[in-house]
């Protein structure tokens, strides 16, 4: 199917100019004129803006306030004059039966992106369609997201049909779903050190970690389930499980810094404490990992266990699709972005609410994947004998360390790789600045420039002139600011840095100059 690019420019004084790559255009300050153009300017084509939210913002600003409130609530029965109207952030703009989509998410771009010409948008649109075709998921006219294209394809439908759902297990075993859910939602994201590394900080991650772990999971329809309050031989030999109990992580243990066990610590953040942790539920793999590497011990109360049925060769419901997506990454950088996004979003859908016929919710699988990622990091740290002073940060499926390691001989799905040794600034668990990464819309280069200009400051910001999107206006608590052309500040503050940490720092940088010139070590939270 054809795809047509669109561009919208705000000319001021209420006038908007909308142009399509097929040569159609309109310039008007009248909402009906603009909606009529969007509705009727092209036929039999997929229509795209690069940044859908930016384009929609100027149109939304013209909508009368009572109707705008309904649009903001995703009301599907809104009519503006003779035009049915629907808009969903980052997904779709619909006028009548004519739909518009955004390309930005396919390219993995952050919130703010450079302005791209209409010809450039058309080239990107053509690339997206060609890439989806080459990946076998191009048989759709709904470009709401990469995973939506996958779900609409025959490949996606067959994949979802073959994934066991949580509610399909015996009702007598439903409690294991609650155990799994309580063992989940514990991403390991920590800053062990804060400071500036111009070199000598190596970024390691496990390639397509969640996809790799999913590919190894057994089909639960080939398994038996049971609950036990003893950790006997049968329980120890289980394939999977979720155990309720309490960990004691050795405070002075040689490998306590490698612990995969996450709990709520300071500032209500998740972190890796040591000492006697409160009773919680953990995956069996976490218990095995802690005990195997001498990190601590576990006082078992009870748990749910899973093993393959005797005489049954287990199936692997995620194996084919995850390997397929990984192989398709080689097509192009765009294909790599799309394939990675689909794989991770399929995993994410394992804990989405069961609100549609194509729901694949399965708390067991999701908890096994996320806890498995933490255990993989522990295994990497222990087997490479990473010392506490060499570990700088952990970020879900990877680490940054100060020791150079030999590249592994194995590659492929789930292998460890070193992405390089890049200048990096670490400020807090979720503020790691390296290359063009943009935590909170600030880059490594931005920080250097701002600190060099004001070395003694503790607060920095830069501004970008953009239209306020509906999502941003909602976050501001005032939807009527949508479409307003305003300076959107991106801030970088050292004030209150303690409140961003999940570990104990005896000292922290107070100025930009101190941040760039020093490094700051931390200690874990100790539970009594």
Where are these regions (language model features)?
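Gly/Thr-rich phosphate-binding beta-strand-loop-beta motif of the actin/hexokinase/Hsp70
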Residues: 1-21, 208
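Conserved acidic
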Residues: 21-528
């Amino acid at each position: 199917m054809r795809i047509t690019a669109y561009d919208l420019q705000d000319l001021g004084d209420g006038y908007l100019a909308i142009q399509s790559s097929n040569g159609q255009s309109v310039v008007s300050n009248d909402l009906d004129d603009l909606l009529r153009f969007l509705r009727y300017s092209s036929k039999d084509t997929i229509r795209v803006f690069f940044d859908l939210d930016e384009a929609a913002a100027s149109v939304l600003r013209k909508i009368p306030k009572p109707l705008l409130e309904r649009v903001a609530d995703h009301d599907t029965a809104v009519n503006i004059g003779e035009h049915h109207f629907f808009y969903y952030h980052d997904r779709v703009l619909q006028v009548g039966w004519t739909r518009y989509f955004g390309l930005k998410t396919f390219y993995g771009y952050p919130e703010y992106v450079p302005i791209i010409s209409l010809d450039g948008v058309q080239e990107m649109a053509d690339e997206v369609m060609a890439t989806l075709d080459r990946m076998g998921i191009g048989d759709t006219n709904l470009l709401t997201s990469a995973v939506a294209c996958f779900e609409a394809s025959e490949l996606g439908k067959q994949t979802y049909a073959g994934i066991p759902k949580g509610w399909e297990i015996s009702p007598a075993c439903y409690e294991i779903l609650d155990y799994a859910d309580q063992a989940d939602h514990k991403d390991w994201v920590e800053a062990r050190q804060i400071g500036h590394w111009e070199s000598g900080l190596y970024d390691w991650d496990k390639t397509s970690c969640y996809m790799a772990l999913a590919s190894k999971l057994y089909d639960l329809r080939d398994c038996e389930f049971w609950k036990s309050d003893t950790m006997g031989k049968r329980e120890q030999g289980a394939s999977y499980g979720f155990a309720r109990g309490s960990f004691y992580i050795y405070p002075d243990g040689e490998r306590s810094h490698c612990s995969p066990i996450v709990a709520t610590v300071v500032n209500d953040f998740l972190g890796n404490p040591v000492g006697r942790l409160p009773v919680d539920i953990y995956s069996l793999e976490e218990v095995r990992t802690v005990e195997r590497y001498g990190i601590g011990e576990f006082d078992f109360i009870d748990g749910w266990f899973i093993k393959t049925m005797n005489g049954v060769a287990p199936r692997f419901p995620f194996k084919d699709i995850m390997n397929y997506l990984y192989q398709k990454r080689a097509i192009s950088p765009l294909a790599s972005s799309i394939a990675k996004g689909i794989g991770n979003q399929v995993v994410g859908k394992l804990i989405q609410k069961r609100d549609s016929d194509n729901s694949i919710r399965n708390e067991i699988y999701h908890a096994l994947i996320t806890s498995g990622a933490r255990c993989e990091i522990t295994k990497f740290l222990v087997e490479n004998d990473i010392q506490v002073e060499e570990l700088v940060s952990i970020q879900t499926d990877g680490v940054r360390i100060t020791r150079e390691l030999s590249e592994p001989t194995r590659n492929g799905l789930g292998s460890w790789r070193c992405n390089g040794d890049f200048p990096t600034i670490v400020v807090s668990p979720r503020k790691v600045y390296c290359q063009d990464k943009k935590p909170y819309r600030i880059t490594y280069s931005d920080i250097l420039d701002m600190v060099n200009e004001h070395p003694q400051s503790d607060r920095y910001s830069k501004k970008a002139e953009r239209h306020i999107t509906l999502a941003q206006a909602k976050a501001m608590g005032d939807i009527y600011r949508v479409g307003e052309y305003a300076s959107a500040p991106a801030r970088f503050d050292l004030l209150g840095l303690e409140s961003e940490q999940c570990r104990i720092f005896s000292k922290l940088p107070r100025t930009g100059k101190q941040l760039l010139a020093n490094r700051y070590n931390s200690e874990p939270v100790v539970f009594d």
